[in-house]
């Protein structure tokens, strides 16, 4: 059994944070699964959107760390949606059901792409206050699979899993990263054929982000510079798309830094969210913010943040 799955932190998380299931569509089979932790008085929480192979609990490190600092954190698992518009409409209904007018979104890989599409979808009546995009992309054509996107629903689960496992690191990795990969493989095994097929369809369906619709959104781009499924060209395209974005660079972390470099990822999320302290868009309980921190935040520069190897 994987080290993460039997770790004290993961078991503490599973025993203290309940998994909720919410239906917002007419189709009762479309169920959002989510963990909602931290002070309910916070009305602009940070919401985590997982990658193709991930479930809501892959962000358990961030939930534990950020709620300990006073933040409200929600981690989601998607229902089966087959196109981006359907996803955006369902996500909007979910926010309405949770009585959340605006939110901060952290998206990993596919989650980051969907976060951008939702910000674009709601640009006339904005629901997204800020974005943190981790190992993410802005154009699905980078995967060269737009021509197969409409056939994933026909493929058996074992074939879909084989496609996804091909993106996991196969070379030598450090023990912490190996544990993260084992955990993600376990999470992948928990997804059924429809869930896998719909996520791969969303990941590869021909689509791109229209940046002019979300140019006023605060963005942090978080990239890892070792073994990642994303090419350097895809990362450079993100930098061009968001020239004013803050950049959080991790030298190592692979495809799943939120698991194997969780302390650094949580720190950069905290740095990103500090710009909203003292406003109605704060994701933190005001009682947890000191006057000194607010003063420091007023002079906090837009910058690139580098992480040293652990």
Curated annotation (Swiss-Prot):
The answer to whether UniProt assigns keyword Manganese to this entry is: no
Which keywords does the record carry?
Cytoplasm
Disulphide bridges: none
Q: Which is an annotated Pfam family here?
A: Abhydrolase_1
Report the subcellular localization. Answer: Cytoplasm
> Entry's Gene3D superfamilies?
alpha/beta hydrolase
Keyword Cytoplasm among UniProt keywords = yes
Gene Ontology molecular-function annotations: CD4 receptor binding
Q: Where is the AB hydrolase-1 domain?
A: 87-159
Any one GO cellular component localisation term in the record:
trans-Golgi network transport vesicle
Record-linked InterPro entries: AB_hydrolase_1, AB_hydrolase_fold, Maspardin
Q: What transmembrane ranges does the database entry give?
A: none
**Signal peptide start and end residues:** none
- Return the similarity comment: Belongs to the AB hydrolase superfamily.
Identification of the protein by name: Maspardin
């Amino acid at each position: 059994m994987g080290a993460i799955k039997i770790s004290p932190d993961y078991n503490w998380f599973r025993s203290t944070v309940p998994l909720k299931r919410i239906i917002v569509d007419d189709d009762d089979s479309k169920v959002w699964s989510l963990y909602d932790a931290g002070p309910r008085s916070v009305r602009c929480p940070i919401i985590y959107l997982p990658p193709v192979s991930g479930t809501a609990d892959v962000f358990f490190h961030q939930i534990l760390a950020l709620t300990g600092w006073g933040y409200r954190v929600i981690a989601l698992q998607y229902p089966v949606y087959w196109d981006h518009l359907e996803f955006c409409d369902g996500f909007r209904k979910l926010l309405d059901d949770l009585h959340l007018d605006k939110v901060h979104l952290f998206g990993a890989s596919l989650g980051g792409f969907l976060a951008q599409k939702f910000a674009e979808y709601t640009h006339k009546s904005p629901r997204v206050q800020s974005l943190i995009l981790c190992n993410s992309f802005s154009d699905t054509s980078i995967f060269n699979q737009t021509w197969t996107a409409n056939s994933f629903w026909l493929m058996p689960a074992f074939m879909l899993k084989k496609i996804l496992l091909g993106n996991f690191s196969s070379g030598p990795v450090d023990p912490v990263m190996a544990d993260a990969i084992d955990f993600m493989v376990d999470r992948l095994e928990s997804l059924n054929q429809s869930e896998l097929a719909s996520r791969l369809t969303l990941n590869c369906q021909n689509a791109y982000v229209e940046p002019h619709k979300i140019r006023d959104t605060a963005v942090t781009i978080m990239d890892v510079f070792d073994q990642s499924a994303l090419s350097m060209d895809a990362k450079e395209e993100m930098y061009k798309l968001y020239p004013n974005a803050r950049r959080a660079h991790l030298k190592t972390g692979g495809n799943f830094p939120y698991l194997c470099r969780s302390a650094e990822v949580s720190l950069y999320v905290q740095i990103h969210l500090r710009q909203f302290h003292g406003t109605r868009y704060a994701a933190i309980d005001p009682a947890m913010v000191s006057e000194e921190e607010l003063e420091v935040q007023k002079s906090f520069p837009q910058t690139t943040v580098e992480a040293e190897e652990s």
